[in-house]
Amino acid sequence: SRAPVIFRNTPQWFVNIDKDLKDGKDEFGKTIRERALHSIDKLVEWVPQSGRNRLHSMISMRPDWVLSRQRAWGVPLTCFKKKGLKPDNEDFILKDKKLNERLVNILKEEGADAWFQEGAKERFLEGLYPPDEYEQVMDILDVWFDSGSTHAYVLRDRSDGKWPADLYLEGTDQHRGFFHSSLLQSCGTQGQAPYSGVLTHGFILDEKGFKMSKSLGNTVSPQQVIKQYGADILRLWVAQSDYTVDLRIGDEILKGVTDSYRKLRNTARFLLGNLGKYSGHDNVSYNELPDLEKYILHRVCEIDKKIKSSYQDY
């Protein structure tokens, strides 16, 4: 909106990432930070390696996680605080197993809206605690907590799911987003990262390196490229690109790809044309080949091994 930002101190709910959780899941560390750093270093494969370095630096230096937000609607924190007590008091937050079970059952049946309905506090506390002695917390969770918990209901709690996930795949901006929140949430509840591998890709920019935007009129759609240049040109552009960094695309770049495509196509046509009547009866033994042809075969063999190895490693 380009409006000025106003900073002000307000009460919020935090997750202490350096507190000993004492949850019996301390194989990889006692605190969320310890578990996260161990997971980054020992349990997760990073493609490219720079992704590991970036997230490791963020986790090492980050403060506690601010969980709460003040919005009209969202996933509620679903907790009650005792009136007249301060946050450092052990009884400040109402902790009760029966109450938690009631909350889970109602929210599972009716959704998050049940928390925001009129009379919700009285309904949840009925028969357990005097409603007048408690204040219902109306803050919602950070939306990154929502996405960060997907490992539980998408993977762990599904019969066809596998936990941890083989791979989390997102753009470079998700080191501070999805990868980050998923790691903290999982380390707090499960003791380790929810993924075995993380692959980070760059973004597609216009020919001059600017972010694509409808307002700037510099967007390039795949359909537009295919219509103008053909699907094979787009495929070749993708195949020869390093997806781990930001990529540029535009008319001049695609013209260069078209030239490369013509060279490949003409070379293939030349080879096929000369091999049209080849039956295998005129084979020349390896020992009788000229040194240059032996070298070419050697390079082809090296490339073949490298490609197969890369496919298997991936």
PLM region spans:
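Primarily the internal scaffold of c-type cytochrome electron-transfer domains
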Residues: 260-261, 281-290
